[in-house]
Amino acid sequence: MSTAEAPSPISGARAKGNTAVKSALVEAAGEMLAEVGPKRLSVRDVAERAGVNHGQVHHYFGGKRGLLEAAMHALAKQHFDESLESAGGAAVPAPLALIEHRTYFRAVSQCVMDGDIDLVMTVDRDDEVSVPLRVLHHLREANPQSDDLDLRAGFAAAAAMQLGWVAFEELLLVLAEVEPGEEAEFQNRVKTAMSQMLGIATN
């Protein structure tokens, strides 16, 4: 039995052709990173979900690590592009934009819990796919006179709020005694509070 239950293969038919095989493997690996993390993820399970022979992982990616890096990069790139679009091209994403990218968030969380920060950082050193790096660069450019340690501390605090909300939204709603019907307005006010930390506008 596979480590995590899921349709296998994801497309409903075996992937064929170089591009299709690579895409299927990357998609399946991204899903499983979010579900079980890098340590428990099995190359055979990924290949089964993707509908390809597990030998293709080594053929296209050189092994498990190469596939994990490709999967994390793909998830981060999607988050980067879509957050940039939703923010109208602004460097700083809209508050709680990460809610729309829970697979990426869960993949990052699983890597951190597995102690594999390096896998996350293969992405977060890349200007082309790292939302945090994009935001930090923007803050430095917009506030050249600011103490850099203060700026980075504010950045980290705001990031922690975003990550914490996505992880614990249901619990936070309970703890804050949010009543049925108040959720949307409450979330809007949370967005306002987060925006004030980075000095950005909310919709």
Question: Language model features by range: what are they?
Answer:
Residues 1-8, 130-145, 167-203:
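C-terminal peripheral helix-coil segments that are non-catalytic and often amphipathic
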Residues 1-36, 40-49, 62-69:
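Basic, helix-initiating cap at the start of DNA-binding domains
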Residues 24, 107, 153-160:
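Amphipathic alpha-helical interaction segments
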Residues 51-61:
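Short hydrophobic/aromatic patch on the recognition helix
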Residues 68-75, 83:
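Alpha-helical DNA-contacting segments of helix-turn-helix folds
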Residues 77-84, 117-144, 149-153:
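Amphipathic alpha-helical packing segments from all-alpha helical-bundle domains
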Residues 77-113, 155:
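Hydrophobic alpha-helical connector segments
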Residues 98-137, 169-172:
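Amphipathic alpha-helical segments used for helix-helix packing
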